[in-house]
Amino acid sequence: MFIYDKKLQYPVKIDNPNPRLAAIIISQYGGPDGELGASLRYLSQRYSMPFDELKGLLTDIGTEELGHLEMVGTIVHQLTRNLSESQIKDSAFAPYFVDHTVGVYPTAASGFPWSAASMQVKGDPIADLAEDLGAEQKARVTYDNILRLSDDPDVNDVIKFLREREIVHFQRFGEAIQLLREKLNQKNVYYMNPAMDL
């Protein structure tokens, strides 16, 4: 099902350590709108999709989100490697450091650890695809917020790439809802569960 290519989807080369940025960007690793939740959401939702095209789309995007998880983890790692003790003490990264040193742990910028409660798999294709539209928009907004707080061009380059992919995924999920409606002969899919009521 998966083929692992031993390179990142987009290159990550951060030259300057920055614990403040790491403490913010970790949210896209394990925060409520981050890549871990996105990948698990889509790879789980695919099972209840009634059509192969939709299963394939969720598999493709879910797999891509795993690649984005790897990219965000790489950013956090590169921002925190070789930090001095004073850089850690004088930053918002210090509380994270106490629990995880410089390991990459799935948590939100707020310090709340990743939880499956931040994602949804309903088993109703319309409900799940609508959830996915919202998830992609929330991830895009989070990347926008990171760009507002970041002054590192190496970080911003990668964040802009990830932000663009959220927009593409949003568009694909919109197309998926349209495809679902067409496949159901324009039945009012908002009053039925296509996974159960076909």
What are the roles of these predicted feature ranges?
Residues M1-L198:
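Non-heme di-metal
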